[in-house]
Swiss-Prot record:
Transmembrane segments: none annotated. This is Glycine cleavage system H protein. Belongs to the GcvH family. CDD domains: GCS_H. One of its GO terms (biological process) is glycine decarboxylation via glycine cleavage system. It comes from Xanthomonas campestris pv. campestris (strain ATCC 33913 / DSM 3586 / NCPPB 528 / LMG 568 / P 25). The keyword Hydrolase does not apply. The gene is gcvH.
Amino acid sequence: MSEIPGDLKFLKSHEWARVEGNGRVTVGISDHAQGLLGDLVYVELPAVGDTVQAGNGAAVVESVKAASDVYSPVTGTVVEVNASLSDKPETINEDAYGEGWIFVVEIDDKEQLNELLAPDDYAELLEDDAH
């Protein structure tokens, strides 16, 4: 299993959130999730300006095996999307925690971040899933 970055927060549905410090949160899917999905062939991005709700679908990733919703970890407004994923969805497979980010949300309520899983808790969830 790949290393889980210590600066991220997670949802049980395998999305990650990186708090940028300027009231913005970058969102992607975990390396575990991309591994389960296999080779990604398409990413449906939200539109800049869309309002997203914590726990609701905001994007879709499709592999040769399945399509999966990407849930927003926080409520807010989409301020940026990773448009390069339209041409290269496999970037998520190659670098899930870096270049494979999906969208950025300007967060409405920073308290929501406290409800997300810390890296250690996420690692524990993955271990439990494996048994």
